[in-house]
Amino acid sequence: MEENPTLESEAWGSSRGWLAPREARGAPCSSPGPSLSSVLNELPSAATLRYRDPGVLPWGALEEEEEDGGRSRKAFTEVTQTELQDPHPSRELPWPMQARRAHRQRNASRDQVVYGSGTKTDRWARLLRRSKEKTKEGLRSLQPWAWTLKRIGGQFGAGTESYFSLLRFLLLLNVLASVLMACMTLLPTWLGGAPPGPPGPDISSPCGSYNPHSQGLVTFATQLFNLLSGEGYLEWSPLFYGFYPPRPRLAVTYLCWAFAVGLICLLLILHRSVSGLKQTLLAESEALTSYSHRVFSAWDFGLCGDVHVRLRQRIILYELKVELEETVVRRQAAVRTLGQQARVWLVRVLLNLLVVALLGAAFYGVYWATGCTVELQEMPLVQELPLLKLGVNYLPSIFIAGVNFVLPPVFKLIAPLEGYTRSRQIVFILLRTVFLRLASLVVLLFSLWNQITCGGDSEAEDCKTCGYNYKQLPCWETVLGQEMYKLLLFDLLTVLAVALLIQFPRKLLCGLCPGALGRLAGTQEFQVPDEVLGLIYAQTVVWVGSFFCPLLPLLNTVKFLLLFYLKKLTLFSTCSPAARTFRASAANFFFPLVLLLGLAISSVPLLYSIFLIPPSKLCGPFRGQSSIWAQIPESISSLPETTQNFLFFLGTQAFAVPLLLISSILMAYTVALANSYGRLISELKRQRQTEAQNKVFLARRAVALTSTKPAL
């Protein structure tokens, strides 16, 4: 600014009348009145100059400034020096990194004195704050694949990065569940003695007999069938519920493990959802102007190296593209006539009816496939051919996978026809796909419940004796675990088959066939909604089956590890950046919300099995009990009387009613506090707008007075 004041003055003088030309101002006059420089120093934008560097001059402070401008510059310098004298460490000054480093070197001794000053409470608070910051930095440095996620976000957008971030989060959940399972289930099982073997065929009871082991030598085809279906040698192994012996302490730890895993997953998902909600509300609100916020505030000045800089540039570019797409669609919707609006809503209603019809047909097909599986397994031809028997056992899984493979592309074709924005289209595709996947799982569980409980009729002939269908399902918990095991395994095989047989051959075809045909065959985009819903579906299957198949979280951990590297290889070798992107802020909130929905859905069959369905009489740690939960009161009765009274008090109304009242009061207080903060924020926004208007008016009046003063 000081090197060429003439050009600077001309630029200001030609901009909307804020400054008159230098010649029009004439020579300095001794008449009283504020100068233009002093008026402009009152603008909000002038205050930001103090944070750029100690040597930056205020608005209008040119090299040949008048005497009033010199006084303004002197006053401005005094304000800056006052800020420098404040007892703030260099790291807290709102300056660029280079200026803060220079300030720290000049005032190293003063920073040490400032840090050591204050009361003992202040010093402990600062020490605790710094320890907390260092702990967060250490935990952040321990996060796996941090650089890989940054690279993905820079090259393919933040939406694709959110998929891999969710995959890493789910991997953490499965690792925690596996560690808890090993500590609370496997170790007590082996420390309590060698588990007993399976019941023999000669053991009879009112609930029939149960012999899970195959007798004699078996062929390789049978071994492969047992591996893929969970039967044979795997049926009586730590993989499934029926293996664990009926020991009271083991039964309690087994049940506590299930509740602990559910609680930990709930808390971690809620924490992630709240963090994503903050970002979503900030992005969707009008508190920040989207374009200016990303252009002026999104850059990280701590980046080092050309690679990091290019990645950050790509991320900002993708975010701006999303904003521009959203703006175009909103403008088109704003200029629609009444007839166009009616036509759009009619199209939306018809398309939603089509979606409902497709979903209904898919659910009926899943129910039919599950019901026919039991009938087909009893056919002699199926029993003689292992491959055909394997196909019949996998019939529900195959049908669910087929539905999940066919219908989501149909939903993607329907969504653009409804006239929504890109973010809204993504939300509708996700909602329909998640409803398809999770509801298909619910239909499968309902069909299994119908077989286990004889359709809910406890007086039926097959269920009257033991409370469950002991003739077809002598150990129904293991059968349910086997179904979830097959779903998990088939999902992994499907992902491998799609990557190896479809995606990579398409890329090879692109290289072998130049021209339009090769480009059409090789152009692939990473479909974030489908991939995310695949993760949530797989995790929901694990939550449903982990109680009946305790090693399922460990298997899912291995699966997610393979999936991460496979998807990464597929992304960088066969996929191109998406032509249409969507907001990562909405994804960061919506994906955990759908995951929370999957956790809620998985808890329903688990809680129903624990409280209402009688456990199997021939397998599992709860055999002989009227219900799985009955083991808890029986274990409590063996505790000291004081402990019993306290635990039973927690389940009475004398404890529940005050807890409900206190929770209601705290919730009402939180809501009232949030409303008051919201009103305060609205008032501050209005005040900020008023102050800005006042300053603009005063600046214009000052310009007018300054330009007319010499003529008087």
UniProtKB/Swiss-Prot annotation:
Catalytic activity: chloride(in) = chloride(out)
Bilayer topology: Multi-pass membrane protein
Pfam family, one: TMC
Region (Disordered), start-end ranges: 1-39
Regions that span the bilayer: 169-189, 250-270, 349-369, 395-415, 426-446, 484-504, 543-565, 593-613, 655-677
pH dependency: Optimum pH is 7.4 for chloride transport activity. Transport activity is suppressed at pH 5.5.
Function: Voltage-gated chloride channel involved in high-concentration salt taste sensation. Depolarization induced by high NaCl concentration may trigger the activation of TMC4-mediated chloride influx into taste bud cells, helping the return to resting potential. Also allows permeation of organic anions including gluconate, but their current amplitudes at positive potentials are less than that of chloride. Involved in pH and temperature-dependent modulation of salty taste.
Species this chain originates from: Homo sapiens (Human)
UniProt name for this protein: Voltage-gated chloride channel TMC4
Aminoacyl-tRNA synthetase as UniProt keyword: no
Gene behind this protein: TMC4
Keywords: Glycoprotein, Ion channel, Ion transport, Membrane, Transmembrane, Transmembrane helix, Transport
UniProt topological domain (Extracellular) ranges: 1-168, 271-348, 416-425, 505-542, 614-654
Main location: membrane
Reported temperature dependence: Optimum temperature is approximately 40 degrees Celsius for chloride transport activity. Transport activity is decreased at higher and lower temperatures.
